[in-house]
Swiss-Prot record:
GO molecular function: 5S rRNA binding; structural constituent of ribosome
GO biological process: translation
Subunit structure: Part of the 50S ribosomal subunit; part of the 5S rRNA/L5/L18/L25 subcomplex. Contacts the 5S rRNA. Binds to the 5S rRNA independently of L5 and L18.
Organism: Roseiflexus sp. (strain RS-1)
Protein family according to the UniProt entry: Belongs to the bacterial ribosomal protein bL25 family. CTC subfamily.
Region entry Disordered, spans: 185-218
InterPro entries reported for this sequence: Rbsml_bL25/Gln-tRNA_synth_N, Ribosomal_bL25/Gln-tRNA_synth, Ribosomal_bL25_b-dom, Ribosomal_bL25_C, Ribosomal_bL25_long, Ribosomal_L25_dom, Ribosomal_uL5_bac-type
HAMAP family recorded: Ribosomal_bL25_CTC
Physiological role: This is one of the proteins that binds to the 5S RNA in the ribosome where it forms part of the central protuberance.
Protein name, as recorded: Large ribosomal subunit protein bL25
Length: 218
């Protein structure tokens, strides 16, 4: 289970284009929504949010305390970023019922060493960086481990169905989805091309003589 965090939010009365003034003063506008509750406009100190986001990411439960509302269990669901600076300019919190399963995207962490990658013959080709799972909010893992130590030949790969999931967690991503595989390095491809080039070609004169002999026998 992921670590639980607590965050205090203030109700926000500034809406629309006026939120630019909040951002200039170091305040991040946000919205809390979820099944069975009306969306709540809130605000938080931008630095405090950044600190929580670095630790919690999008898979750890956060207990939200908002004046005038009961505590809410939520995830950081979506972020809006400035198109140039990439600073976070708005956050969405998704409140959840701890008794009901939810579907979320969980990051994949690569562990282990592939013998072919270590020898320089191959490079790792990671196709998916997250997978979709379904679980109770309290059972959602911070990440799913992908062990690549068994990738010792180019015909081996890891698909979503091969991942080891914790108890109570169900895979939502299609099982046949490729997670990670191996690709030849340029150096290895170059060696194969050199080997092919070194194979002596049959002299033209020998081929002509062989073809003439076959015609005579016919």
């Amino acid at each position: 289970m992921s670590e639980k965090f607590t965050l205090s939010l203030e109700p926000r009365s500034v809406l629309g284009k006026k939120v630019k003034r909040l951002r200039r003063s170091g305040i991040l506008p946000a919205t809390v929504y979820g099944k069975g509750i009306e969306p709540i406009a809130v605000q938080i100190d931008a630095r405090s949010f950044q600190a929580i986001y670095r630790q919690a990411g999008r898979t750890s439960l956060i207990e939200l305390h908002i004046a005038g509302h009961p505590p809410l269990a939520a995830f950081i669901h979506a972020l809006q970023r400035h198109p140039v600076t990439r600073d976070i300019i708005h956050a969405d919190f998704r409140a959840v019922d701890l008794r009901q399963e939810v579907e979320v995207a969980v990051p994949l962490h690569i562990e282990g060493k592939s013998p072919l990658v270590e020898s320089g013959e191959a490079v790792l080709n990671q196709v998916l960086s997250t997978i979709e799972i379904r679980a109770l909010p309290t059972a959602i893992p911070a990440h799913i481990t992908v062990d690549i130590s068994a990738l010792d030949s180019f015909d081996k790969s890891i698909h979503a169905r091969d991942l080891m999931l914790p108890p109570g967690v169900t895979l939502v991503t299609p099982g046949e989805e490729l997670v990670v595989g191996l690709a030849h390095t340029r150096a290895a491809e170059g060696e194969e091309e050199e080997a092919a080039a070194e194979t002596p070609a049959e002299p033209e004169l020998v081929r002509e003589r062989r073809e003439s002999k076959e015609e005579e026998e016919e």
